[in-house]
Every structure is written in C-alpha cells, then in structure tokens.
C-alpha cells in the first residue's frame, strides 16, 4: 500500500508539471510527440501507465479519447489535473491528441495469472454481462467504446466502482445502468480477467 503522504506529494508534483505545460503557449512544441510528453509523464512511456489508478492510453480508440478530452475540457467530467491540462485546447487540438494517442502501442496485458479460477470466473462474467458486445469480442474497443483489454487492473476496478456508484460522468448512462446489479466481488474478477487480455 502506498503511503498517503507520498501519494499526495506525487499527485501535487504531477499537477504542477501538467499545469506548467498547460499554461505554456502551443508554440512551445514542434511536434505532437513533444506535445504528448506531459500526457505521458502520468500515463506512461508509450501510453503504458505505471502509476496506480492512472489509465494506460496506448491503442485507445480515437473517438473515445476525443470524447473524454472534450468532457474534461468542458468540465463535464471533473478531474482537476485533466481539466487544467486541456482547458486551452481547441477542437483541432483535441482531435490531434486523440489520433496520436490511438496510434500508441497497446499496453501489454498483466502476465501474473497465478489464479486460474479467477480467470475462468472473469471470462464467464464478461460473457454474462455482455462486456464483449460493446467493447468488442477481444475487448479492444471500437468507435467511441474504449479499449479495456490490458488496462491497469486497479484503474478498471476504480472505474467500474465509479460507474456503479453513479460517480463517473459519461456521455450516456449505459455503463452506470450495466454496473448497478454487479457485486463488488464480480467487479474484482472482471478487472482481473480484463487486465490480462492482450
């Protein structure tokens, strides 16, 4: 478990770095790779996050990223770091970032499969709750539906709990509705299985 003081200090440092980049004029960067640098400071090199509860972005669908960036910019989805990071972005900026993020490599799945029973339960739950209908059969997402395969397990748990608790804002209510009847034990198994998919 991460020391709460260290977690708070790390969060403040990340906020400071992102705010520094967000307040600088767009002319500071020569390329999209340069402009993505502050994003990857938190979301990880090549979009593969190593920070607890911070999602990996690699191979995320461009329409989904565009919608999320828009929600952050308009403060329809509230998370201070992200709201500040994109507040000055134009619609073209949002599209450019969404396209660039979608071209990052997919994160490798978690390889620790020490609990085969949880894998079996998780796979059955994916079918039972039809996650593979919207998120695609391989959970790689499509169109405005996000890639969840290989995503950080802790982020998946956090996100599903937020949808279940009607805390997570979205552009429609479908995930909140889907998550309502799912008990926490099933959320843990769903996340365990999904994080280990390529």
Q: Locations of the language-model features?
A:
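N-terminal secretory signal peptides that target proteins for export/translocation
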Residues: 1-11
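Bacterial N-terminal signal peptides
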Residues: 12-25
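Sequence/structural segment immediately N-terminal to covalent heme-attachment motifs in c-type
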Residues: 28-48, 109-110, 114-137, 152
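Gly/Gly-Pro-rich "capping" loops immediately C-terminal to redox-active cysteine motifs
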Residues: 32, 47-77, 83-89, 123, ...
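C-terminal capping alpha-helices of c-type cytochrome domains
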Residues: 87-109, 154, 180-198
């Amino acid at each position: 478990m991460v020391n709460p003081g260290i977690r708070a200090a790390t969060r403040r440092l990340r906020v400071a770095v992102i705010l520094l980049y967000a307040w600088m004029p767009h002319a500071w960067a020569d390329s999209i790779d340069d402009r993505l640098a502050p994003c990857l400071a938190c979301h990880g090199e090549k979009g593969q996050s190593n920070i607890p509860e911070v999602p990996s972005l690699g191979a995320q669908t461009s329409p989904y990223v565009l919608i999320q960036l828009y929600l952050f910019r308009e403060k329809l989805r509230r998370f201070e770091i992200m709201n500040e990071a994109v507040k000055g972005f134009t619609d073209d900026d949002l599209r450019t970032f969404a396209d660039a993020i979608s071209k990052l490599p997919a994160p490798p799945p978690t390889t620790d499969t020490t609990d085969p029973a949880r894998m079996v339960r998780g796979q059955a739950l994916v079918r039972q709750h039809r996650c593979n209908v919207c998120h695609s059969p391989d959970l790689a997402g499509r169109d405005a539906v996000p890639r969840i395969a290989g995503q950080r397990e802790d982020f998946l748990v956090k996100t599903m709990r937020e949808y279940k608790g009607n805390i997570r804002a979205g552009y429609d209510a479908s995930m909140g509705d889907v998550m309502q009847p799912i008990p926490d034990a099933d959320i843990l198994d769903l996340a365990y299985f999904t994080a280990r998919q390529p």
